[in-house]
Amino acid sequence: MGSINNTDRIIYVHASNSDTLTLTNLTNNGTINGKVSVENSKGNFTGTITVNTFENKNQINGNVYMGIWSSSQGTLNIDKFNNSGTITASNGQGVFFEGKNTNIQSFSNTGVIVSNGSTWSASGVQISNASMDNFSNSGTISGIVGVYVNNGNIKTLENSGFIKATGKEDWSAGIKLESGGTIENIINTGTIQSNSLGIAVTYGKFGTLTIKDGGVIYGKRTGITVGQWQTLGDLYIDGTSSKKDGTVSGIYSDIDGIVLETGSSSQKIELKNGGIIQGKDNGIRLDNAASLSGEMILSGKGSRVEGGSGAGISNDGGKITGSMTIKDGATVTSSSGQAISNSGSGSITGGITVSGENTKLEGNIINTGDASIGSDIKIEGGAKVEGGLVNQGNGSISGSVQVSGGSSIDSITNEGNGAISGSITVDKDSKLDSITNTSTSDTGISGSITNNSDNKLEISNGEGATIGGGITNNGNADLVISNQGSVGKDDHGNTVTNNGSGSVGI
C-alpha cells in the first residue's frame, strides 16, 4: 500500500468537532509505504476517538502517529498497540503518541521500531503530554533518542529487549524524560544503550528503577544522568542472574556510571548479589547541592562500584543524609586510589559502614576541601580498607572512627587544616597500622585514640599539630609515638596510658 519513499499519510483516521469515532481493529499483514495517522482533523475537536486494537505484523515504512494536537479538548483512547513487525521512519518519530487527553492502556513491541532521522525529533517512540499504563519492549527500539517522554506519563515500562539511542549529542539518551515527563516504574532485564546518555531526566521524575536478570544500562558519557533539580526515586540493581553470555546486571559508562547533577535528588540506591556500577571516571558522582536522602546499600559477593580516574563514589558538594553501607563481600574501588571521595562543600551525615568478610574498599576514604563527615565511620566484621582515611584541606570529621571485628585499615591521616573531633578506636583482633597528624588547625585530632589491638600501631604527631583527647594502649603489641606537637589529656588526666603488655615508645 503506497509507494516507496512516500512521506504522506496512507492510512488517515480522523474526527472533528464533537464526533465520536471507534476503530475496532486495524491490523497490517502487508507493507505500508507511508504514514499511519489517527488524529483530530481540526483544532476545535471536542469528541472522542477510540482505538481498540492496532497491530502491525509486517512492514510500515513511515511514521505512526496517534494523537490529539493543538489545544483541542477531545479524547483519544487506545486500548492495545502491538507491533511484531517492523516500523521504519526515515525522519521524525517512529511511533508518536500526543495529547493531554490521549490515554494508552497497553503498548507492546516484540518487533522493530526505528527512526533513521538525524534531528532531535527522530526518536524511536515519543510520548508527549499523553498517559500510558503499560509499556513493554522485548524487541528493538532505536532513534536519536530511543524512548522520549515529553510531559507525558508512563506507569510501568518493562524492557527485556534492546532500546538504543544513536545520537552522540549531549541531549541524546536511550530513555529520556523532559518537560515534566514521568515514568513511575522501570524494570530492565534487557539492554538500554546510548552513544551519549543511557537514561536521562532533564526535567521530570523517575519513580523506581529496577535492573535485574542481566539487564544493562550503558551510556558513553553517563549510564544514568539526573539533571539539575530533578528526581530519581529508588534504584535497585540485582546481579543474581546473569545472561547466557555472562553479562552481569549493572550500569556502565566510559565516563560516569551515575550522575546526580546540581540540586538533583535520589532516595535510595541498592546494589546486591554481584551487580555492577562502573564508570571510567566515577562510579557514582554527586555534584553541588545534589542529595541522596535514603540509604546506599552495596551488598553481596561480586557487587562492585568501580571508578577510574575519579572515585568509586564521588560526592563533590552534594549531601548524603542517608546511611552508606558496604557489606557482605561488596567492593568499592577506583584505579586512582580513591574509593570514596567527599570534596568541595560535600557532607555525609548518615554514616559510613564497611562490614563483613571479603568486603573491601580498594583505595582511600578522602575528605577534602570544605567537606564534612558528621557521622561515624565503621570498619567491622572482617572488612578491609586497602588504603586509608585521609582528612585534608579544611575537611572535618566529627563522627567516631571504629575498627572492629577483625577488620583492618592501613592508615588515618589528618593534614592541611583538617580537624577530626570524634574518637578513634581499634578493637582487639583488628588492625590500624598508623595515624599521622600534621594538621595546622587549632583542634587537629581532638578526640581520644584507643588501641585495643594486638597489632603494632605507630602514631606521628607533627610539629604544631595537636592530639587533644589522650592516647590509650590496651593491646599487647607495641605502640610507637613520634610527637613534635602537643598531646592533651584523657578523662583521667593522662596524656598517654598503657594498660596492655606491649611497650609504648615515645
Regions found by a protein language model. Give the residues of each.
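Surface-exposed loop/turn motifs in large extracellular/passenger domains
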Residues: 1-35, 39-63, 68-92, 96-196, ...
